[in-house]
Amino acid sequence: MASLLLFVLVIQIITYLINTIGARTIDSLLWLLYIKLPNQASQVAREQRHAKLEVIRLKREMSATSSQDEFAKWAKLRRRHDKAMEEYDVKNKKLSALKTSFDWTIKTVRWVSTTGVTVILQFWFSKSPIFDLPRGWLPWQVEWILSFPRAPLGTVSIQVWGGACGTVIALVGGAMGVAAPAFKKINQPRGEAQKMGTPRGSREQTPVRKTQ
């Protein structure tokens, strides 16, 4: 069961990283990578950016054109601007629909690969011990808790092992988050700390007594 032990540990680490970084942040990064690939979404994204730039350009030309002195030119620019705006709205709605579908797919894959796999493993291996405890090492009450709910007495169940892994990973991650700023401060170069001292040229001068 060593492979199952490590597999549960890896799932808990992945789950912790997702919760720490944030699902939305990960989804946004994956979307940016996805639209860089040669697919329909990347094509629509390029067309949407092109339409947006065209709207901005026409709007600037309209602002630089007087609606009174150059009404004919201004009206022509206005019609082109409205048409470009409509095209931009169509591309933007299409891109939003593709992103919604992409986000739903990513959420489904993320749930299946973490929570879904955990539930399936806990159900399928509920009677299988992750590892055996030394005989007589712990009281039978503690052994019963560690084997909960259906693993043999004197062993550790997959449910208990998964919960223990999640707790330890969260504690280690929290400790690293607290220790990182302190470690960075300790390793700060001394030159930067010395800059906070008395600036050059600001020494106090000893008063000189005048002789009569």
From Swiss-Prot:
Residues 201-212 have a biased composition (Basic and acidic residues). GO terms for cellular component: endoplasmic reticulum membrane; GET complex. The keyword Cell cycle does not apply. Residues 189-212 are annotated as: Disordered. Keywords: Coiled coil, Endoplasmic reticulum, Membrane, Transmembrane, Transmembrane helix, Transport. It comes from the Eukaryota. InterPro entries: Get1, Get1_fungi, Helix_hairpin_bin_sf. It is found in: Endoplasmic reticulum membrane. Residues 75-99 form a coiled coil. The chain crosses the membrane at residues 5-24, 111-131, 156-172. One of its GO terms (biological process) is tail-anchored membrane protein insertion into ER membrane. One of its GO terms (molecular function) is protein-membrane adaptor activity. Belongs to the WRB/GET1 family. Interacts with GET3. Required for the post-translational delivery of tail-anchored (TA) proteins to the endoplasmic reticulum. Acts as a membrane receptor for soluble GET3, which recognizes and selectively binds the transmembrane domain of TA proteins in the cytosol. This is Protein GET1. It comes from Arthroderma otae (strain ATCC MYA-4605 / CBS 113480). The gene is GET1.
